[in-house]
Regions:
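Short alpha-helical elements
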Residues: 1-301
Length: 301
């Protein structure tokens, strides 16, 4: 659980960002042409709602309602004095989807160091036996197949560096090819150097397109890839691809990005963003030690 001092620090970051976001929104948003609709501002600010979502995914609670009523309203009331009812909080979650996304993209993501890892993980929304009666994500989620078999839901595409910091993420339906997000400029805008992936990212056209943008896509070689060579350092770093698998594991088992209790698509997105934000604020992340040790004891002269 995050300490109270850390909660205050994160809240100040989120509050400053929300104030800047509201100022820019008011400056560039078009005025309504029709009759002005009455809109009552909430007693709980956007930064407080964002902070509650981040705290939930780092608290160990499995039920958001129980966490809010028992933890926030009782034990953290001195940090959140303007608490609202649970039903009202669920309504306010939808309003922070865009600010929370930009807060993650502009503030919480790490920086590229020249060594990056890419992978995708599945997000099931129901069991396979319930696909034909599932209604919450009907028309949005799709059937897909991965190394774990068939599933119904979405894919979360991630890029991280050797420090375990997320560099970017993208959410797609389950039937989207893993290589498809790498074709979008916004997904690889701040990526440079070597990008390591599994065999699912092998593609001649994709390699050439990324190489033009200054990205070298490194994957394991297939038996029919004659004439392809790989340096020793690339082979060693390919063995360390488990770092992004560990990131996926922490997102699922600690931050709870995957469960089947969602009741609408809006809250699914906000909970997913809250989990990603919570992971970005973890004090300890999986990392790789890339320090080189020069030892000449075995050198032959």
């Amino acid at each position: 659980m995050i300490t109270e001092d850390k909660i205050t620090e994160i809240f100040c970051m989120a509050d400053d960002f929300c104030k800047f976001f509201d100022a820019m929104t008011a400056k560039y948003t078009l005025k309504p042409a029709g009759k002005r609709k009455y809109h009552r501002s909430s007693t709980m600010s956007k930064a407080e709602v964002m902070m509650i979502m981040i705290l939930f995914h780092d608290s160990g609670y499995r039920c958001f309602k129980h966490f809010y009523l028992e933890k926030v309203c009782k034990h953290l009331h001195h940090l959140f004095p303007n608490v609202v009812s649970y039903n009202r909080l669920v309504e306010l979650e939808r309003e922070v989807a865009v600010p929370l996304t930009l807060f993650i993209k502009k503030v919480l993501l790490g920086k590229c160091t020249g060594i990056s890892f890419v992978d995708s993980t599945l997000l099931r929304v129901c069991k396979n036996q319930r696909i034909h009666i599932h209604k919450v994500f009907k028309g949005i989620a799709q059937r897909g197949k991965c190394s774990m078999g068939w599933f119904f839901g979405f894919k979360l595409h991630l890029i991280c560096n050797e420090k375990g910091e997320l560099l970017n993420f993208m959410i797609t339906p389950g039937d989207v090819d893993d290589r498809k997000p790498l074709e979008y400029k916004a997904f690889i805008e701040f990526i440079q150097g070597r990008l390591f992936g599994d065999k699912g990212y092998i593609g001649k056209n994709l390699f050439q397109r990324l190489f033009v943008d200054g990205i070298q896509l490194v994957t394991r070689l297939k038996s029919n890839m004659k004439g392809a060579l790989m340096s020793v350092s690339d082979k060693l770093l390919l063995r360390k691809r488990a770092i992004i698998e560990t990131v996926n594991d922490e997102l699922k088992n600690i931050a709870q990005v995957e469960h089947s209790r969602h009741r609408c698509f809006d809250n699914f997105i906000v909970n997913l963003l809250g989990a990603i934000a919570a992971y970005c604020l973890f004090p300890k992340k999986p990392c790789i030690n890339l320090q080189r040790t020069i030892d000449t004891q075995l050198a032959l002269f």
